[in-house]
Amino acid sequence: MKIYYIGVFRSPAEQSSDEKALELTEVKDLSQFGFFERNSVGQFMTFFAETVATRTTAGQRQSVEEGNYIGHVYARSEGICGVLITDKDYPVRPAYTLLNKVLDEYLVAHPADQWKSITATNDSLKMAELSTYISKYQDPAQADAIMKVQQELDETKIVLHKTIENVLQRGEKLDNLVDKSESLTASSKMFYKQAKKTNSCCIIM
């Protein structure tokens, strides 16, 4: 069981607009990937998280399966969205318990007036505790312990998607989003295409 990524995003103001979710803070654990793969894999985790955060409406929880990975996404009514990327073995309930904890704490530390109108994130919006959490909560039992002080999670309200294609808008293709992405370097785009051809398990897509 493994957590690879925890991130907090500002949700788009309107779901129908071209605005993307804005990553406010994140942490990654790429230790299981080869040294030369880590940069490209890290970029794709951010790209994947941004893509699903942009397409998750306020109040919605959805888990998006892609390859060997699952992105757990929770968009809050306050205008922020949490994303947790794990392997397929990490249980759903602890994943959302951790996301809820992260978002609760983020809103206390960073009220909406700090990030509602910004055009780019900055270091003042980071959440240092994420580094602790991505280590501590590799053990799902630790996250389950939070349940004692949080309300019960209704797992039936979590939407499970078998592939990221299911959350894309009609007519959108993942390959096209990769090509148009400004957050991915040319080498990472090439890495994605090669990994897709070989069905490599070392890449997030």
UniProtKB/Swiss-Prot annotation:
Record keywords, A-Z: Cell membrane, Coiled coil, Lipoprotein, Membrane, Methylation, Palmitate, Prenylation
Record lipid sites (S-palmitoyl cysteine): C201
Xref: Pfam families: Longin (PF13774), Synaptobrevin (PF00957)
Gene Ontology process terms (BP): autophagosome-lysosome fusion; endoplasmic reticulum to Golgi vesicle-mediated transport; intra-Golgi vesicle-mediated transport; intracellular protein transport; vacuole fusion, non-autophagic
Lipid sites, type S-farnesyl cysteine: C202
Cysteine methyl ester found at: C202
GO cellular component: autophagosome membrane; endosome; extracellular region; fungal-type vacuole; Golgi apparatus; plasma membrane; SNARE complex
Prosequence residues removed at maturation: 203-205
Residues annotated as domain Longin: 7-131
Superkingdom: Eukaryota
Location(s) in or outside the cell: Cell membrane
One function term, GO molecular function aspect: palmitoyltransferase activity
Main location: membrane
PROSITE patterns in the cross-refs: LONGIN (PS50859), SYNAPTOBREVIN (PS00417), V_SNARE (PS50892)
InterPro entries reported in the protein's UniProt record: Longin-like_dom_sf, Longin_dom, R-SNARE_YKT6, Synaptobrevin-like, V_SNARE_CC
Domain v-SNARE coiled-coil homology: 145-205
Membrane topology recorded in Swiss-Prot or TrEMBL: Lipid-anchor
Family, similarity comment: Belongs to the synaptobrevin family.
Protein name: Synaptobrevin homolog YKT6
Organism the protein comes from: Candida glabrata (strain ATCC 2001 / BCRC 20586 / JCM 3761 / NBRC 0622 / NRRL Y-65 / CBS 138)
